[in-house]
């Protein structure tokens, strides 16, 4: 993830790209050994769903018991930051160019989709993980699940 495309992307856009990447990621267990995204997406979805409740519970518990508010606020902020960290990582990952090993897989899957009669838009620029996810999602929808065995 050290080689990002030139041009700065605002932090808000990175979070948006992270959400789009998370929504586009195919929920196929066969991808879990190859990509860390499967685990990150599941953890981020869990965090988005439950961490705000954990933060509210922590604050309420400390206020109700007359405890110190400082540690409770720190815990609540930490709990709310966990899903944001996942979205940030996914956003950065989505704009990262593919390494050479995945680049060949990307082109092979595109070729299989073309052979299956699917029209694909030409690749503009260097392929990124977002482009790979879109191709994989389409391949899982239209091709036989065994297409991963050939890669």
UniProtKB/Swiss-Prot annotation:
Pfam families under this entry?
A: DUF412
- Which InterPro entries would you find in this protein's record? UPF0208
Question: Hey, what's the signal peptide range on this chain?
Answer: none
Which keywords, in A-to-Z order, does the entry hold? Cell inner membrane, Cell membrane, Membrane, Transmembrane, Transmembrane helix
Q: Name one GO cellular component term.
A: plasma membrane
Membrane-spanning ranges: 46-64, 70-90
Q: Where in the cell is it found?
A: Cell inner membrane
Protein's membrane topology: Multi-pass membrane protein
Q: What's the chief localization of this chain?
A: membrane
Alphabetized HAMAP family for the sequence: UPF0208 (MF_01101)
Q: Which family does it belong to?
A: Belongs to the UPF0208 family.
Name used for this protein in its record: UPF0208 membrane protein SG1605
List the source organism. Sodalis glossinidius (strain morsitans)
